């Protein structure tokens, strides 16, 4: 079967199997997919993208919005470019497909150009790796693809994540004339009849059976938390402590400044914790979950479940809300937690008001106050700044690549979120709203080439570069105290000399500069169409971070 016809059969099968987007990176061995896309073999959203690394993280962003994307790359180093995005998707449990074009078996291991051993390249970081040799379109081909999509979605009983489908193509890689073109008997087109694989539904455990009575219980929600976290909190009286990217802020009900609780004498009274998602931002939270005297209930529908300290008392796939009335002792303790959070908020407000007003913490508050669309927070300092200083994100959708917590591909991820959320091109989003991505200067520089992706996609995206002159996150960790300022700047800071206005112009993005958070608020109140790079210099303010942590302890 001609390679283009095989590519067409693959794309049409993925279309009916539920793949929503195809991101195509150009190449010769992957060219059959290009011809098939041009011929309309895929009915969803198909877009060409130059940079494989950017395409990988755009797919991560799409998956974060609930889409099911596929990335098409050619053979050789193009496959390796996807490794950072595949790792992020694997640890964040995000479904996506990698369609890697390959040489046929007889051209591998013999010195052929652009040929390497790329089948199974991603090892344990993919849920499945399928190797397709050149073959006819058939139910067997569709069956392999159905298994790939099911594995990516975690069906019927696995964990969602990336899947590699390695597709070998023989020459010719261009369309060939069919018999029907020459007047001979027409060949019936291949019509895929895919297998639908349904996910298994977890049976919720009874709250009273696994959590039991508690006088000082908490719910801790990290990235990927159950949407039922707020319901559990309301039914049990357990205060809800939620990281910004947990999703548990939506609709309200979360207790802010969670570190004010767990690091204080009040936190030592905790006797039970229900954990959902993957909480990784706060060292005090991790210390709490490691306490041997604590009953820790992990709610995780997938294996391996999240239990960093190995201290879980019980693990369940799902949990019913409590049925019994809230205990008087629990209600009284929860009231004290809320009062402690209010007190911490007032003291943090006072610290910020007496400061310069030009720190990452001030910037986080300004962004939260002046935007209403989805937020994409850099996985280093920005997400921590929101966690420390922003009292409420009610109703906001917040994303952060905390699967591996790297700075890779943050701009590309934000572009994918724009595509998946209707904030690109002729947007379906509410008028005047945009996606706002907040990241440090090193994160922005690391993914600067994805500004081209933002412009080509018409992403309605504000990229706020909180420029603290290099790796400011390390100054708030032990490394900021363990070395001299000169050594710190040399080995940890790595300040970059970048003309951000010229950078934006080079890629066709709008530009603005915000000298202080108030100027940033004014800019964000005046949305534009397409991508905009906003350079916002901030101070590192290590002393302020330490003062706030003192307030929270």
Regions found by a protein language model. Name each.
Residues 1, 287-381, 508, 514-522, ...:
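Phosphate/pyrophosphate-binding active-site segments
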Residues 2-87:
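N-terminal cofactor/phosphate-binding cores enriched in small/glycine residues
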Residues 7-12, 28-34, 337-432:
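Active-site diphosphate/adenylate-binding microenvironment
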Residues 46, 88-89, 95-99, 106-119, ...:
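Thiamine diphosphate
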Residues 64, 75, 80-81, 205-208, ...:
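Glycine-rich, anion-gripping cofactor-binding loops and their flanking helix/strand elements
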Residues 72-74, 95-102, 123, 133, ...:
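Short beta-strand segments
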Residues 100-148, 242-344, 454:
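Glycine-rich, acidic loop regions that bind phosphate or pyrophosphate groups
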Residues 120, 157-202, 522-553:
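Glycine/aspartate-rich loop-and-adjacent alpha/beta segment that forms the canonical ThDP
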